[in-house]
UniProtKB/Swiss-Prot annotation:
The organism's taxonomic lineage, starting at the top: Eukaryota, Metazoa, Ecdysozoa, Nematoda, Chromadorea
Organism of this sequence: Caenorhabditis elegans
Protein name: Protein lin-10
Composition-biased stretches (Polar residues): 1-16, 143-156, 169-190, 301-318, 490-501
Low complexity: bias regions: 119-134, 432-445, 454-464, 539-550
Annotated consequence of substituting residue 445 to A: Abnormal endosomal localization upon hypoxia treatment
Annotated consequence of substituting residue 16 to A: Abnormal endosomal localization upon hypoxia treatment
Keyword tRNA processing (UniProt): no
């Protein structure tokens, strides 16, 4: 290759705003290749691709390009253009001084020498046919003139250009040539190198001539550059910076010219069609455009060009080489130079917004071009993650930990199979040919499918290129439905060739990688936590049950539980039982919810219990609740083992439904493959159950003994079939032990209610709302007030006149509070008396007395503040006359609640009644707002927690006895408040 064949023509300058060429060049076919070997004498100085040592943070000059002469403003035809042309070595020297001066002006030191030092990876001599490796200039003092280093730091699309050298001089001078200057070869294909768009204008010829003269003069100088040359070049660079910043070289172009630029012949260069990467910093990748059915590509607008990375419609697209081109590519690889292209992790948006780099010819744009070979990539990438430029200026680029090595619009698979060692050119060519043959089966280093577009196909004009592969490989799945958006999200896409949809390339090449989904892992973790919580809850329940068995209450506690059960139905369950149920609330609550569903009770529910024993007793036909409770206690005393003895018991399942109650053996018997049964130990019809009681953890079930003389299982309390002497009815009492004793009793009561409703429906009454309305009205009518408070206020006998003597100006020495909303007569109540005051000395008043009037002024219905004002006004009197009704300070309330389905109608907070439902059960029973609950069913709740009080009220049924008093009075009597006497 002669030195005249290595010249570079001017390329179109790109506007930073539009990213489109501002000067057009007539596309011409590539020149015919002639000549055989490369430049004379250059083969002995060749070396194989080198390895770069990462220099750290390096800031490339974004304003100048070492190989493209900078053109001035558009001028008339025939006039010479101001230009500045120099060789790569000269450019490096100028940039070295430029950066030193720039860093010195800012008060810093330039951290690294310029140009960057490179370490040769291999020192193997190469034949003269491969004549594009690094050279050394005679006058560069041993520095490499690797222009591709600067070029690769300027733009990801900038390819390395190594000019062929003569035996006596470095051909860095641009010759006056009207043709596209490319490395020549004996092959008919274009050799590996940068294709520079030619220019036929005389201005470029004059620029080339001027550049040659400058270069020849420069080579004659010594190694030390004069200050005048540096000042001149710095002045030119400052002018270039000013011109670029002001955008004076923008040239308007119409649609026809734009179509001519992007629709040229297939052999023209495509450097103009790639706008700088700076303009793409804020754009997101989208799915490829659908294939066009028409052959002619439509004209594109500036907006489409601004957001497009693709090659023109009829340009040659880089892609994998087919099998038919493998020998040709192997020969071409052996006969042409190898060079680096876009190696290393390169930050795409490395330059400030608004600064435009001069685009270079796209690598691989010529027919038959191949991307960087795998062994070259491996040698160049020995240093892990070499990053050329840090993204410190672009605010639109997201921070990435590691960025991939990529070439847009498809690259050949890069397989790192060749290690860094000495290779001959023949070995490298053979390895390249073998890699090309195994290309289709070789996995890519990114675990992403290789491009499926062949090198001869053409994609639709204006289609967007796919996004670069991720830095960390992630398993992707391809949408089975072929939705483009889903494929875009998954990082996979399907390419089109001549309008036909192609199958993703990674479908059958790689083995599938199975990864557990996050949802499945979370599900396993939830199940594990649930099992651990259940195990802990059962352990806590077992511990609580054991402690309760060891610390069980005596006869007094059993009597309290018995009274509570008698008065409140299934209030049943002691406070210890409620605490034990707290650890297994989930299971208990589920069963409690089940018993409220009629359909569940019709089918039946199961409770696990321990059967302690049974006994038989005589009973009256219509015995009272107290008598039945006494019988239940007697049955427990008969069956339960004495203290200290081992209690014999058997695990059983208690089945409860609306028809019967059965005691089942827990051992399952398999009758067949589909029939598994339990032995029935006892079976009682629901109508034979006469009484159910829960005493702590014990459940007593009383069932009437059926007469053997009656086939209809009627009760034996009637006459016998012979009409003889009446027999005393007998009941059999079964004693069970269970932690769910209260729920068992409640379920049996619910079963009776559901059975009754079903009986009414069977007889034509099928309106549940009607039944509920009648039922609730009956419950309201059953409420009654204890003590006949209304009669106490109505009768004169219960009222008394009290005269309290005192001194003038002396207060009475009393504290009054409200009687509470819900009381029969809203007035004030005497809550406290000063022990040394006139009221206490009179011995006529008691705490709890309700004051009707004072000195003839009625206090009924007055607010508390108004009543207190009236009492204070009596301070000047020497005697005070009052009408009072003597009532105890504690109000007794009795509520009848047949079942838990009827709400009580009041709310409680920390034992204080906060609100009351008008017309409800509680109001009918005498509950008052503002009162403190003192006792529930004989159990003091003064020092009981709020949750326990609520549980006691929520589960209480039957007759509920409560004692309350005004909260203020309670706090005064207990010393929680200081009295303010009036």
């Amino acid at each position: 290759m002669s030195s005249e064949a290595v010249a570079q023509a001017t390329a179109a300058t790109t506007s930073p705003e539009h990213g489109v060429p501002t000067s057009s060049a007539t596309p011409t076919p590539p020149p015919s290749k002639g000549g055989g070997a490369g430049g004379g004498g250059g083969g002995e100085q060749q070396q194989v691709p080198f390895q770069m040592i990462p220099p750290g943070h390096f800031f490339a000059n974004p304003f100048l390009n070492p190989y493209i002469p900078t053109a001035g403003a558009p001028a008339q035809e025939g006039e010479a253009q101001p230009q500045m042309v120099f060789s790569p070595a000269q450019y490096q020297e100028v940039m070295h001084h430029y950066f030193q001066q720039m860093m010195a002006a800012s008060g810093a030191q330039f951290p690294i020498p310029f140009p960057m030092q490179f370490q040769p990876a291999l020192q193997q001599p190469r034949p003269s046919s491969q004549a594009s490796s690094s050279h050394r200039s005679e006058d560069d003092n041993g520095r490499q003139t690797a222009g591709s280093v600067v070029s690769s730091n300027v733009s990801p699309n900038h390819r390395e250009v190594r000019p062929a050298e003569d035996s006596t001089e470095t051909s860095g001078v641009v010759q006056n040539n009207d043709e596209l200057l490319v490395p020549t070869s004996t092959s008919s294909d274009v050799t590996i190198g940068d294709v520079i768009e030619k220019s036929d204008s005389p201005e470029n010829s004059q620029e080339s001539a001027g550049g040659e003269e400058k270069s020849e003069e420069k080579r004659k100088l010594s190694g030390d550059r004069t200050d005048s040359l540096i000042r001149k070049q710095m002045s030119e660079m400052e002018k270039e910076i000013t011109r670029r910043s002001q955008n004076k070289n923008i040239k308007t172009i119409d649609d026809d010219g734009l179509a001519e630029l992007i629709g040229g012949s297939s052999t023209r260069t495509v450097a103009d069609d790639f706008s700088p990467f700076v303009d793409k910093s804020g754009l997101s990748y989208t799915a490829p455009a659908p294939p066009s059915t028409e052959k002619s590509a439509p004209k594109e607008s500036l907006n489409q060009l601004r957001s497009s990375f693709n090659l023109p419609d009829d340009s040659t697209t880089v892609g994998p080489v087919g099998p038919s081109t493998v020998p040709q590519q192997s020969q071409q690889f052996a006969n042409n130079s190898m060079f680096m292209a876009n190696a290393g992790n390169f930050v795409q948006n490395a330059f400030p917004i608004g600064v435009t780099m001069t685009p270079q010819a796209t690598f691989g744009a010529a027919p038959g071009f191949q991307m960087m070979q795998p062994h070259q990539h491996n040698l160049f990438m020995q240093q892990p993650n070499p990053t050329f430029v840090n993204n410190g200026t672009n605010p639109f680029l997201q921070t990435q930990a590691t960025l991939p090595n990529f070439v847009q619009n498809g690259t050949a698979p890069l397989v790192p199979t060749v290690s860094a060692q000495q290779f001959t050119p023949e070995q490298l060519a053979a390895a390249f040919a073998q890699q090309q043959i195994a290309q289709s089966a070789a996995p890519t280093p990114f675990d992403s499918p290789p491009p499926s577009m062949p090198s001869t196909s053409s994609g639709p004009s204006g289609a967007l290129a796919p996004p670069p592969p991720p830095s960390h490989p992630i398993p992707r799945r391809v949408s089975g439905n072929g939705w483009p958006e889903e494929n875009k999200e998954n990082g996979t896409s399907t390419s089109t060739t001549n309008g036909a949809q192609s199958v993703p390339a990674a479908a059958g090449t790689d083995d599938p990688v199975w990864v557990l989904r996050d949802s499945y892992l979370k599900k396993m973790q939830r199940e594990q936590r649930t099992s651990e919580e259940e195990e802990m809850s059962w352990q806590e329940a077992a511990t609580a049950a054991q402690e309760a068995a060891e610390n069980g209450g005596g006869d007094d506690q059993e009597e309290q539980e018995t009274d509570r059960l008698l008065n409140g139905g299934t209030t049943g369950a002691s406070t210890k039982g409620a605490e034990r149920r707290g650890s297994v609330d989930k299971k208990k609550n589920s069963k409690e919810t089940m018993v409220h569903e009629p359909a569940v009770l019709i089918e039946g529910v199961l409770f696990r219990a321990r059967y302690l024993g049974s006994t038989q007793m005589l009973c009256e036909s219509r015995g009272s609740k107290a008598a039945r409770m006494a019988q239940a206690q007697e049955a427990v005393a008969r069956v339960k083992a004495p203290e200290g003895d081992v209690q014999p018991s058997t695990e059983i399942d208690l089945f409860i439904s609306t028809e019967k109650i059965m005691v089942l053996n827990t051992d399952l018997q398999r009758i067949s493959d589909t029939d598994v049964r339990q032995d029935i130990l006892m079976d009682h019809a629901l109508r034979t159950i006469s009484y159910i009681a829960d005493i702590g953890d014990l459940v007593v079930l009383m069932a009437r003994r059926m007469s053997t003389s009656h086939s209809d299982e009627s009760c034996s309390d009637g006459d016998s079939s012979g009409g003889g002497v009446r027999k005393t009815p007998k009941v059999i009492c079964h004693v069970f032990e269970s932690d769910e004793a209260s729920f068992i009793a409640q379920s049996i009561g619910q079963a009776f209610q559901v059975a009754y409703v079903e009986f009414l429906r069977a007889n034509g009454i099928d309106d549940p709302s009607y039944l509920r309305q009648i039922d609730y009205q009956e419950v309201l009518n059953s409420q009654e007030l204890l003590g006949d408070e209304l009669e106490m206020f109505a009768k004169k006998e219960t009222q008394k006149e009290v005269v309290v003597p005192k001194k003038a100006g002396e207060p009475l020495g009393i504290v009054v509070v409200e009687s509470g909303w819900g009381s029969m007569l809203p007035t004030v109540v005497l809550a406290h008396m000063n022990p040394v005051g006139p009221a206490a000395h009179s011995n006529k008043l008691n705490i709890g007395d309700q004051i009707i009037n004072i000195n003839g002024i009625s206090l009924v219905g007055l607010p508390l503040s108004a009543a207190q004002t009236q009492i204070k006004n009596m301070k000047t009197a020497t005697a005070v006359r009052m009408t009072v009704v003597s009532t105890p300070p504690v109000v007794e309330v009795r509520i009848r609640r047949p079942d838990t389905k009827y709400q009580l109608g009041f709310s409680v907070q920390n034992g204080v009644i906060c609100s009351l439902l008008r017309g409800g059960i509680a109001e009918r029973g005498g509950i008052r707002v503002g009162h403190r609950i003192i006792e529930i069913n004989g159990t003091s709740v003064v020092a009981v927690a709020h949750d326990r009080i609520v549980n006691m009220l929520a589960t209480a049924v039957g007759e509920i006895h409560m004692k309350t008093m005004p909260t203020s009075m309670f706090r005064l009597l207990t010393g929680q408040e200081q009295p303010q006497y009036i």
